[in-house]
Regions:
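Conserved small/polar residues in nucleotide/adenosyl-binding loops
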Residues: 183-188
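A short acidic, often aromatic-flanked loop/helix-cap motif at beta-alpha or helix-coil junctions
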Residues: 17-21, 67-69, 148, 161-168
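Active-site regions of enzymes building and remodeling cell-envelope glycoconjugates
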Residues: 8-11, 153-160
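Beta-strand->loop->alpha-helix junctions that form or flank phosphate-binding loops
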Residues: 62-63, 162, 182
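Active-site-facing substrate-recognition patch
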Residues: 1-28
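C-terminal functional extensions of proteins
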Residues: 156-179
Length: 190
């Protein structure tokens, strides 16, 4: 959404998070009671909180300190994740270091029962695939906004965003409102 102001043409920021909400609601249904959404860092709290509210789950936070670009040291887990099935919710995964460290902290420091993760964009550069394969993350789900990684480990799954794009194209063509597909100030639909 930040790029919208820098272009000379109309740009619409389509919301992908409803795809994740639908996926987890269908996957777990009423079993969500023992689950918790986790923000992998303090900067992602508002996005993760909105996601947790949509799924009627509680929120925890992994407090970390970044030593340099593409590396971090996980410091603490804020919130009671003991014996909970956790969903780490992030915007993108590049090398996977932050995400895998957060998952490890949830298990080792917080006592979580299990960890899965989702992120809108799977960049997956460098050691990401190997890190994810060797991590305690049970499943990592992305939207297919970036072409899937060839040879991705079996933990990685992609959800299709084409229905949102198709709906947007149809709405533009028919000159209908786009508001239900766009980013709003409510981070739940980001």
């Amino acid at each position: 959404s930040q790029i919208q102001g820098f272009l000379d043409i109309p740009v619409d920021n389509l919301a992908g998070n409803p795809i994740f909400v639908d996926y987890y609601a269908k996957k777990y249904g009423s079993e969500c009671e023992n689950m918790m959404v986790v923000s992998p860092d303090v900067g992602s709290v508002s996005r993760a909180r909105a996601f947790a509210q949509k799924l009627h789950m509680n929120l925890a936070i992994v407090d970390k300190r970044r030593q340099k670009a593409n590396s971090c040291e996980v410091m603490n887990v804020i919130g009671d994740v003991r014996d909970k099935d956790c969903i780490l919710f992030d915007d993108m995964v590049d090398t996977g270091g932050s995400l895998c460290n957060a998952a490890k902290a949830l298990i080792e420091v917080g006592g979580a029962k299990s960890v899965q993760a989702c992120a809108s964009h799977g960049v997956l550069s460098g050691p990401a695939n190997e890190r994810i394969a060797n991590s305690c993350i049970k499943e990592l789900t992305f939207l297919n906004t970036i072409p899937p990684l060839e040879g991705a480990c079996s933990k990685i799954k992609y959800l299709d965003v084409s229905p949102i794009f198709a709906d947007a194209i149809q709405r533009i063509y028919e000159e209908n409102s786009m508001s239900c597909l766009l980013y709003t100030s409510d981070a739940a639909d980001e």
